[in-house]
């Protein structure tokens, strides 16, 4: 199962790289978590043009055959078991999924329209760099649930 994390922003802080790599390396045989970074659209406060530029870059970075899940505070809330069930289903259907993380100004309409699903990690607004670590941990947690590993405790 190939899981792509397609995210806005280059050069994340060390704690973000370390967190992402920690969980990516823990995944068991047959599961890979790959990071694809795209450049930010510019600097500005809620700049719609910057969001559109980021959206174009995100869309170009998406693997063509992957199920695409946009991550957005307005998306559908999903608990850990729902993450695990979805990943399990997608692994049986072809084994590729892309989680899309926008930049500081969120996701463009084009990205939302391309997405097969839109999920929320929290009703809180989260820093996009922190979301990378949260997604990596949830992917690992889902794998442990599906593998019978004792990491997840209900």
Curated annotation (Swiss-Prot):
Tell me the protein's name.
Ribosomal RNA large subunit methyltransferase H
Note the subunit structure: Homodimer.
Which reaction is this enzyme known to catalyze? pseudouridine(1915) in 23S rRNA + S-adenosyl-L-methionine = N(3)-methylpseudouridine(1915) in 23S rRNA + S-adenosyl-L-homocysteine + H(+)
Provide the top EC class: transferase
One of the entry's Gene Ontology molecular-function terms is:
rRNA (pseudouridine-N3-)-methyltransferase activity
Q: Which organism is it from?
A: Halorhodospira halophila (strain DSM 244 / SL1) (Ectothiorhodospira halophila (strain DSM 244 / SL1))
| Role this protein plays | Specifically methylates the pseudouridine at position 1915 (m3Psi1915) in 23S rRNA.
Question: What EC numbers are recorded for this enzyme?
Answer: 2.1.1.177
Localization of this protein:
Cytoplasm
What CDD domains would the database entry show?
Answer: RlmH-like (cd18081)
Family statement? Belongs to the RNA methyltransferase RlmH family.
**This protein's UniProt keywords:** Cytoplasm, Methyltransferase, rRNA processing, S-adenosyl-L-methionine, Transferase
State where S-adenosyl-L-methionine binds.
Answer: 102, 121-126
Q: What is its main location?
A: cytoplasm
Cellular component aspect of the GO annotation: cytoplasm
Q: What InterPro entries does the entry give?
A: Alpha/beta_knot_MTases, RlmH-like, tRNA_m1G_MTases_N
């Amino acid at each position: 199962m190939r899981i792509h994390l397609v995210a806005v922003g280059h050069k994340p802080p060390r704690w973000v790289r370390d967190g992402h790599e920690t969980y990516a390396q823990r995944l068991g045989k047959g599961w890979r978590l790959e990071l694809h970074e795209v450049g930010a659209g510019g600097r500005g406060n809620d700049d719609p043009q910057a969001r559109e530029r980021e959206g174009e870059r995100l869309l170009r970075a998406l693997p063509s055959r992957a199920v695409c899940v946009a991550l957005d505070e307005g998306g559908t809330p999903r608990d850990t078991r729902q993450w695990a069930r979805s990943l399990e289903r997608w692994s049986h259907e072809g084994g590729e999924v892309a989680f899309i993380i926008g930049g500081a100004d969120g996701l463009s309409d084009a990205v939302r329209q391309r997405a097969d699903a839109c999920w929320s990690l929290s009703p809180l607004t989260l820093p996009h760099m922190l979301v990378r670590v949260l997604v990596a941990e949830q992917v690992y947690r889902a794998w442990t649930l599906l593998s019978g590993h004792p990491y997840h405790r209900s």
